[in-house]
């Protein structure tokens, strides 16, 4: 690599999400009338950008959702699924034009979704990714910034610049 080692090492520990969310996988103000439509749109995006079949994505997300809602509350959901043959985790972020019902624990409809696809064999890293996403989305300031961001590039920048420690320090200071 052309960067001195400390820079790339710091970059790696910064956040897992930055590595698995390409800018092309950020969609803003999507129209979706239901949870199913959201999964269909995610499928189309992963098919167009990563070559993962849309029906494979849809079926995987839907199967996981049947086990229990991936809605976290506060208008956020993290639908996720396992994909046979996938080599490494990949994510997508959708901000919906209007929120959809998601059977979230607080009953609130969802308009911020991070869709995560992981290889069939679960690893510790996948749990770390989900944990980091939950931490990100529990940060009210971060949710507000995602909602207010002008476009996909601005949202992508929020995800890549987010730091776990900064969020917990902000919460502690409240």
Stretches with model-predicted labels:
Residues 3-174:
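Cytosolic covalent-transfer regions centered on His/Cys nucleophiles
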């Amino acid at each position: 690599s052309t960067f001195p080692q400390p820079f790339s090492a710091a970059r790696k520990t910064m956040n897992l999400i930055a590595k698995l969310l390409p800018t092309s996988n950020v969609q803003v103000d999507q129209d979706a009338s239901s949870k199913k439509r959201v999964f269909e749109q995610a499928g189309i995006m992963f098919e167009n950008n990563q070559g993962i079949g849309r029906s494979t994505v849809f079926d995987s997300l839907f199967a996981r959702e049947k086990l229990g809602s991936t809605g976290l509350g506060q208008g956020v959901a993290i639908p996720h699924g396992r994909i046979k043959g996938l080599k490494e985790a990949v994510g997508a972020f959708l901000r919906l034009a209007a929120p959809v019902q998601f059977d979230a624990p607080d009953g609130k409809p969802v308009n911020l979704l991070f869709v995560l696809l992981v290889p069939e064999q679960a690893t510790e890293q996948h749990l770390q990714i989900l944990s980091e996403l939950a931490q990100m989305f529990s940060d009210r300031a971060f949710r507000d910034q995602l909602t207010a961001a002008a476009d996909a590039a601005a949202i992508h920048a929020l995800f890549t610049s987010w730091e776990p420690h900064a969020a917990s320090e902000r919460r502690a200071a409240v």
